[in-house]
């Protein structure tokens, strides 16, 4: 039997649109990556606590919760391309507003701008994530989304690298955001003038069942939503306080820690996503997810109880394990949505609000206990649930 092609389906070749959409993954990876450097930067610049600085994450990830359903409505009414363009425009406007923001120099104004950027990122992710899953054979959906997310991983590397070297060197915060804003709006202009396919028939060809008629699938989708919520909570919490942890427990400077985050943590994150897209051609996605959940659980436990070089190595292992989690959980959960893919995508994107919750809780724990390490018990619990979700898929044919 011929193996299904990753980019061909029903006589159509979706390679070119796949490459175009995948390039967008870098943009929001960069936006999230530089956000993690903003956290300690704002702590120093505005002399605020860890829990207060976590409002930066709360603004961006809170936007995912508020904007996901409107973004889904835009996609259902006008298609994926309009959803992407809307996201790029909001992203670009929010980034360019950092120019007057640097003159106003108010923490809360920056939080507002990050909320606008978060709304743009929501539209981008709500459009692009499900779009990659239908640009080819359904059986290769997990491989495609992991390959796309590999570019997202590069953005996560470049973000803290650029942000850390500029912000901790005293460079005006408006400079990196202004450059990103100009680039993003230019991409929006280009996309507004080209035509992209909308393979809605691919969704309809997969199944004629309605998700409401399958209570078991509704429960499975709900578990997928919870798992994605906890993953984003864990990832954001880890990213937000890596630099603080490195300074306190590993005794390295913030600028050096940002390099470790960019090249070590995010470098392995990128490699893991790239390798994951290939491995899932041969190994069931749920098994890869289970292995990564075990790795992240053990690594986080080491981060909590140890310090020094061992905990730094554990952090690197943690980033490697995290790499395939978001796209794999997203794609597995989307399988339980039947024909309701666009609505399901909006609901899944809403779960990214988990990123607004964990940093605040972890910041509060760190401020009250005086230990950043203890706060990492929060992502530890999250990784345990992710392992349970992977096990729950063992009876589901993949």
PLM feature segments, named:
Residues 16-44, 48, 128-129, 238-243:
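Extracytoplasmic
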Residues 58-73, 263-275:
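Central cavity-lining transmembrane alpha-helices of secondary-active solute carriers
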Residues 89-104, 294-307:
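C-terminal ends and interior cores of transmembrane alpha-helices
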Residues 104, 144, 148-199:
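Helix-loop-helix hairpin linking two adjacent transmembrane segments in secondary transporters
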Residues 107-124, 310-325:
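Hydrophobic core of transmembrane alpha-helices in multi-pass small-molecule transporters
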Residues 111-150:
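Cytoplasmic helix-loop-helix junction between adjacent transmembrane helices
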Residues 123-137, 323-338:
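Intracellular juxtamembrane helix-capping segments at the cytosolic ends
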């Amino acid at each position: 039997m011929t193996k299904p092609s990753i980019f061909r389906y029903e006589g159509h070749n979706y390679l070119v649109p796949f490459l175009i959409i995948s390039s967008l993954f870098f943009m929001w990876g960069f936006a999230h990556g530089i956000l993690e450097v903003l956290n300690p930067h704002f702590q120093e610049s505005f002399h605020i606590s860890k829990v207060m600085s976590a409002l930066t994450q709360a603004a961006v990830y809170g936007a995912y919760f508020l904007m996901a359903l409107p973004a889904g409505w835009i996609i259902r009414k006008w298609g994926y391309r309009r959803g992407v363009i809307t996201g790029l425009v909001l992203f670009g406007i929010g980034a360019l507003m950092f120019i007057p923001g640097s003159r106003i120099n108010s923490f809360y104004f920056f939080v507002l701008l990050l909320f606008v950027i978060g709304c743009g990122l929501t539209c981008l992710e709500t459009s692009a994530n499900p779009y990659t899953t239908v640009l080819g054979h359904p059986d290769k959906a997990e491989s495609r989304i992991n390959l796309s997310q590999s570019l997202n991983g590069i953005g996560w590397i470049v973000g803290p690298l650029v942000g850390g070297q500029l912000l901790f060197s005293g460079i005006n915060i408006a400079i990196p955001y202004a450059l990103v804003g100009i680039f993003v709006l230019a991409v929006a202009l280009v996309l507004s003038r080209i035509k992209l396919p909308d393979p809605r028939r691919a969704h309809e060809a997969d199944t004629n069942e309605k998700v409401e008629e399958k209570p078991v699938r509704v429960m499975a989708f709900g578990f997928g939503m919870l798992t994605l919520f906890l993953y984003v909570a864990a990832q954001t919490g880890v990213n937000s306080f890596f630099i603080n942890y490195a300074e306190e427990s590993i005794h390295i400077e913030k600028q050096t820690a940002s390099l470790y985050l960019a090249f070590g943590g995010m470098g392995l994150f990128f490699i893991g996503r790239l390798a994951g897209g290939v491995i899932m051609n041969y190994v069931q996605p749920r098994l890869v997810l289970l292995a990564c959940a075990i790795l992240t659980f053990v690594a986080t436990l080491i981060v909590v109880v140890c310090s020094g070089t061992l905990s730094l190595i554990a952090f690197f292992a943690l980033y490697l394990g995290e790499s395939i989690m978001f796209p794999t959980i997203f794609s597995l959960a989307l399988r339980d949505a039947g024909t309701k893919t666009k609505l399901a995508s909006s609901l899944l994107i809403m779960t990214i609000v988990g990123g607004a919750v964990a940093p605040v809780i972890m910041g509060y724990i760190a401020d009250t206990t005086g230990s950043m390490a203890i706060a990492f018990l929060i992502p530890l619990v999250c990784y345990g649930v992710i392992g349970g979700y992977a096990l729950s898929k063992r009876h589901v044919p993949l």
